[in-house]
Amino acid sequence: MKTLIRKFSRTAITVVLVILAFIAIFNAWVYYTESPWTRDARFSADVVAIAPDVSGLITQVNVHDNQLVKKGQVLFIIDQPRYQKALEEAQADVAYYQVLAQEKRQEAGRRNRLGVQAMSREEIDQANNVLQTVLHQLAKAQATRDLAKLDLERTVIRAPADGWVTNLNVYTGEFITRGSTAVALVKQNSFYVLAYMEETKLEGVRPGYRAEITPLGSNKVLKGTVDSVAAGVTNASSTRDDKGMATIDSNLEWVRLAQRVPVRIRLDNQQENIWPAGTTATVVVTGKQDRDESQDSFFRKMAHRLREFG
């Protein structure tokens, strides 16, 4: 009888342990697969594509690749002598038309004072018309001068914000055309994370929720806040034919891949971010509050580590 009880006890204990292990593993698996997290996340930043508004030879390059620059700092200079001459020519035209307008104004005023008693109405109208024509030419010359002044100012290309010069591909002596991108500027303190969350995990993602960001290959955990969730993504399975009818791609009903939706996360401390834009990371949305590691169970800690390195 005792032997039977002993065997039964061992069997019961084994079954209980197996059930507990199964429950623990199942909970860990659910936590790992269904809670809001993703390894498909990337550091991003605001990037300004800097292109000149004038064409000409590059006469001076004042920066080097990956240099940190301040707002207003000169990056490079384009053929100033040519645009200086254009400004001087425009200024001369303005001076000429100012003198001419003064002469025509005096002539028209004299004829208007004398009136039809001294000359015909046609001569008076002609003087007034000539004055108006000269005034229009003066206005055009002034606009040309202002444009030449603006072009001269824009021969000096300055940094629009604090940031890092990257992909610098211009050199002294090269000819650059208006509108062609010369360099990219990664704005300082503009870094954020784009986490591509599966649609099945969006239930636990809300603006204002806290998030943990672990860069690939690093144990350092950065903190952030969910800033926004994208309002839509492209439907790759639906297109239009040449008649405007919808074309829907066939799919397997028992295999449905979850769509990924971009979630923008704002970093708490910009100064601590040393990861370039475009590098990858793991993101875990912890909810309204930061995760308290001291209260995590062993399985949750293991699941969290799997997220980072799995």
UniProtKB/Swiss-Prot annotation:
Compartments, record wording: Cell inner membrane
Q: Which residues cross the membrane?
A: 12-32
What's one GO MF term for it? transmembrane transporter activity
**Main subcellular localisation:** membrane
Q: What is the top-level taxon of the source organism?
A: Bacteria
Give the induction annotation: Positively coregulated with aaeB and aaeX by AaeR.
Q: Which Gene3D superfamilies match?
A: 2.40.30.170, 2.40.50.100
Per UniProt, which keywords does this protein have? Cell inner membrane, Cell membrane, Membrane, Transmembrane, Transmembrane helix, Transport
Instruction: Please provide one cellular component term from the Gene Ontology annotations of this protein.
Output: plasma membrane
What topology in the membrane does the UniProt record assign? Single-pass membrane protein
Its biological function? Forms an efflux pump with AaeB.
Q: Which family does it belong to?
A: Belongs to the membrane fusion protein (MFP) (TC 8.A.1) family.
Protein name stated in the entry: p-hydroxybenzoic acid efflux pump subunit AaeA
Please name the source species: Escherichia coli O7:K1 (strain IAI39 / ExPEC)
Question: What does UniProt list as this organism's lineage?
Answer: Bacteria, Pseudomonadati, Pseudomonadota, Gammaproteobacteria, Enterobacterales
